[in-house]
Design a protein with these regions (language model features):
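Conserved two-lobed SF2 helicase motor
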Residues: 33-49, 61
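Well-ordered alpha-helical segments embedded in enzymatic catalytic cores
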Residues: 25-29, 46-47
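Conserved interdomain linker/interface between the two RecA-like ATPase lobes of SF2 helicase motors
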Residues: 1-2
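Beta-edge loop/turn motif
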Residues: 11, 42-48, 52-56, 178-183
Length: 271
């Protein structure tokens, strides 16, 4: 989608494959253009729904669950400076070649049902209650596949909660992700060099955080075998810290990109 629109004036892309420092710079530019009334079209993944403080007159969101739609709507007229009739949130169905995952398809189906019932007040408490009630009914025991709630319930009378077992079983995202440090600018390169010679991590980890992206563990292994990343100070810290070698795989528009890396299998690239 971005590739088809990038020739237009004021088109930007936001993704979790950009390090936080990169995203911050992009957002600063985006906010400036919005403030000045300049053309501004942002094509983003769902990361923009996670509390990003931007205010658009129009938001277009691919079909998803009502909670995701509500989060996307929060980027429209966020500052309340426009009249409601001048603020628009459009929900669209992607074309067939961009078929959504089965999980998202179910949530979208429930959302459409709620739209039919609450078309005039989609973000009301009643609409949101109806949405989650139907989702819970359809998903049933699938919501607690690891029986965490059952363990909590069984331990309730004795207060002997198996916290360690619950912590081991609970995982919001099943895919194992690993941080990769991006030598995005001179500051990042200096921090990486400091890490090479550090005996203790100290405050370096916090300073490096804005320069990391999260990638699947399998992709990290493939990148390492291909010589595109390196372990930093492995003697001291083991296999904790990896850095991208150069910026050939990091695009100034789209962030970390591996489109030309044929050795990475498709299933390793799902983010």
């Amino acid at each position: 989608l971005y590739d088809s629109a990038k020739q237009l004036d004021g088109v930007f892309h936001l993704t979790t494959l950009m390090c936080a420092k990169h995203r911050s710079q992009m957002l600063e530019t985006i906010r400036g253009r919005l403030k000045n009334g300049e053309p501004c079209l942002v094509i983003a993944t769902s990361l923009i729904e996670a509390g990003v403080d931007v205010d658009f007159p129009l938001v277009m969101r691919a079909e998803a669950g009502l909670d995701s739609v509500a989060q996307a709507a929060g980027r429209c007229n966020r500052e309340g400076k426009r009249l409601p009739e001048e603020s628009f949130v459009w929900i669209f169905q992607p074309e067939a070649q961009w078929k959504a995952p089965a999980e998202l398809g179910l949530l979208s189906s429930v959302m459409r049902s709620v739209v039919r019932q609450h078309a005039g007040n989609l973000l009301s408490a009643e609409a949101i209650t109806d949405y989650f009630s139907e989702v819970y009914q359809l998903k049933g025991v699938e919501l607690d596949q690891r029986r965490i709630l059952a363990m909590h319930h069984n331990a309730g009378s004795s207060l002997n909660f198996p916290f360690q077992t619950i912590a081991a079983k609970f995982r919001m995202i099943e895919t194992h992700m690993q941080p990769l440090i991006i030598p995005f600018d001179d500051d990042a390169e200096r921090l990486i060099e400091s890490l090479r010679h550090a005996d203790q991590i100290g405050g370096l980890l916090r300073k490096l955080q804005p320069y990391t992206v999260q990638i699947p563990e399998s992709a990290l292994d493939a990148l390492l075998k291909a010589g595109r990343i390196e372990a930093i100070n492995e003697h001291t810290f083991g296999k904790q810290f990896y850095s991208l070698i150069g910026l050939d795989l990091y695009d100034e528009v789209a962030g970390f990109s591996w489109e030309d890396m044929a050795f990475l299998k498709g299933e390793s690239l799902v983010l």
